[in-house]
Amino acid sequence: MQCVSRVAQRSAVSRPRVASRQAVKVQAVKPAEQKAAMAAVAATASTLALALAPAAQAAQEVAMLAEGEPAIVQIGWAATCVMFSFSLSLVVWGRSGL
């Protein structure tokens, strides 16, 4: 009979007691509070977008550097820049009247 009493004690201990339930008062959100919450969400989203823009640009630049250009293309662009700069300097010097 001791075994039966121990089983009864264990089952009584292991059973969770039912919590008493209380009514919860629910209030509707005021329009002003809702607008303030939406403004906060919009501000957070815009801040996040501005923070991610430089990161996205940097990732694109890294991808472009990883792909690379042939040396002849880089030399061609450098020559074009030099010719343009020299031409512009000759025009400015010629129009200065010296």
Swiss-Prot record:
GO annotation terms (biological process): cytochrome complex assembly; photosynthesis
Transmembrane segments: 72-92
Bilayer topology: Single-pass membrane protein
GO CC annotations, alphabetized: chloroplast thylakoid membrane; cytochrome b6f complex
Keywords recorded for this protein, A-Z: Chloroplast, Electron transport, Membrane, Photosynthesis, Plastid, Thylakoid, Transit peptide, Transmembrane, Transmembrane helix, Transport
Record has Electron transport as a keyword: yes
Keyword flag Chloroplast: yes
GO molecular function: electron transporter, transferring electrons within cytochrome b6/f complex of photosystem II activity
Pfam families: PetN
Cysteine pairings via disulfide bonds: none
UniProt main location, coarse: plastid
Signal peptide: none
General remark: Unlike its orthologs this protein is not encoded in the chloroplast.
HAMAP family noted in UniProt: Cytb6_f_PetN
Family, per entry: Belongs to the PetN family.
Function noted in UniProt: Component of the cytochrome b6-f complex, which mediates electron transfer between photosystem II (PSII) and photosystem I (PSI), cyclic electron flow around PSI, and state transitions.
Subunit text: The 4 large subunits of the cytochrome b6-f complex are cytochrome b6, subunit IV (17 kDa polypeptide, PetD), cytochrome f and the Rieske protein, while the 4 small subunits are PetG, PetL, PetM and PetN. The complex functions as a dimer.
Name of the molecule in the record: Cytochrome b6-f complex subunit 8, chloroplastic
Source species of the chain: Volvox carteri
